[in-house]
Amino acid sequence: MPEPANTESTVVATADLADEIGPEIRSCDTQFIQFGGRAAFSGRITTIRCFQDNLLVKQTLGEPGEGKVLVVDGGASVHTALVGDIIAGRGVDNGWAGVIVNGAVRDSAILRTLDIGIKALGTNPRKSTQTGSGERDVPVEFGGVTFVPGEMLYSDHDGIVVRAE
């Protein structure tokens, strides 16, 4: 199993980044809930835009993550879950640092035991469809931030910060 690219002790604190960058900080306004076993994580961004369909999420987390963070814009829908224990486990096995879901997750009790950062709006036990609709590696926007593939994302208990590095 690949080693994660970062651990909680090596992640730069989002508050420290905010102090360093100042008023121009790209800080996500959306108040996400932490579901993963890793509260602090960082990595290069990969994105998916989908709506109640998680096939692209499943496929992407099945690829080598190399310490990246998958940002999923699910249109803020909590009608179906886009990530559950099996898909998140694929992310752990493939070296992903974290997943941000602008939508819902499920299997939350198990997600808390996995060594991966997972933040989402909430939970829903209903699974999503898997038709493959959506887009990958395109800029997505929510919470006042545009998440651009290849940029750096930092996440901890205080929030989510994005910066070009």
UniProtKB/Swiss-Prot annotation:
Q: What InterPro entries does this protein's entry cite?
A: RraA (IPR010203), RraA/RraA-like (IPR005493), RraA/RraA-like_sf (IPR036704)
Q: Which GO terms describe its biological process?
A: regulation of RNA metabolic process
Q: Which residues bind substrate?
A: G84, D85, I86, I87, R106
What Pfam family is a match for this entry? RraA-like
What Enzyme Commission number does this protein have?
A: 4.1.3.17, 4.1.1.112
Spell out the molecular function terms from Gene Ontology.
4-hydroxy-4-methyl-2-oxoglutarate aldolase activity; metal ion binding; oxaloacetate decarboxylase activity; ribonuclease inhibitor activity
The answer to whether keyword Membrane applies is: no
Task: Name the cofactor(s).
Answer: a divalent metal cation
Instruction: Give the keywords, sorted.
Output: Lyase, Metal-binding
What remark does the entry make about the cofactor? Divalent metal cation.
Question: Which leading EC class covers this enzyme?
Answer: lyase
Reactions performed catalytically: 4-hydroxy-4-methyl-2-oxoglutarate = 2 pyruvate; oxaloacetate + H(+) = pyruvate + CO2
Question: Where on this chain does a divalent metal cation bind?
Answer: D107
PANTHER family for this protein: 4-HYDROXY-4-METHYL-2-OXOGLUTARATE ALDOLASE 3-RELATED (PTHR33254:SF4)
Q: How does it assemble?
A: Homotrimer.
NCBIfam families in the cross-refs: NOT-MenG, PRK09372.1
Explain the purpose of this protein. Catalyzes the aldol cleavage of 4-hydroxy-4-methyl-2-oxoglutarate (HMG) into 2 molecules of pyruvate. Also contains a secondary oxaloacetate (OAA) decarboxylase activity due to the common pyruvate enolate transition state formed following C-C bond cleavage in the retro-aldol and decarboxylation reactions.
UniProt lists the family membership as follows: Belongs to the class II aldolase/RraA-like family.
The name on file for this protein is Putative 4-hydroxy-4-methyl-2-oxoglutarate aldolase
Lineage in the entry? Bacteria, Bacillati, Actinomycetota, Actinomycetes, Mycobacteriales
